Amino acid sequence: MAIEFAPDNIRVNAILPGAVDTPMLRAGLNRGHVGGETIYDRLENLARKTVNGRIGKPEEIAHAIYFLADDTQSSFMTGQALIVDGGATARLSTE
């Protein structure tokens, strides 16, 4: 798509968020509850998968979106997938 829309000066990028503390994440974690594990145990488990030991905040994803939307900061960026996952993907590559 980036190639297709470039002549019209339209940039195409994607945000790939990791675990972000939202009602949707918490609802998903509550589904299929097994054993004595609480939602807080599940949140903690997700946090341990990141290199900084926590899950993301919605505003952190919003900052990435603002960056991509701002032509003064990202006008030369197109065809990219911006991973915002607290380093979880980087950790996977070392395991």
Predicted ranges, named:
Residues N9-R11, T78:
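Residues at or immediately flanking beta-strands
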Residues R11-P17, D21, I83-D85:
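Conserved SDR Rossmann-fold cofactor-binding beta-strand/turn motif
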Residues P17-A27, R31-G32:
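Short, flexible catalytic-loop segment of classical short-chain dehydrogenase/reductase
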Residues G35-T38, T50-I61:
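A conserved structural motif in NAD(P)-dependent oxidoreductases
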Residues T72-Q73, T78-E95:
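Short C-terminal tail/terminal secondary-structure segment
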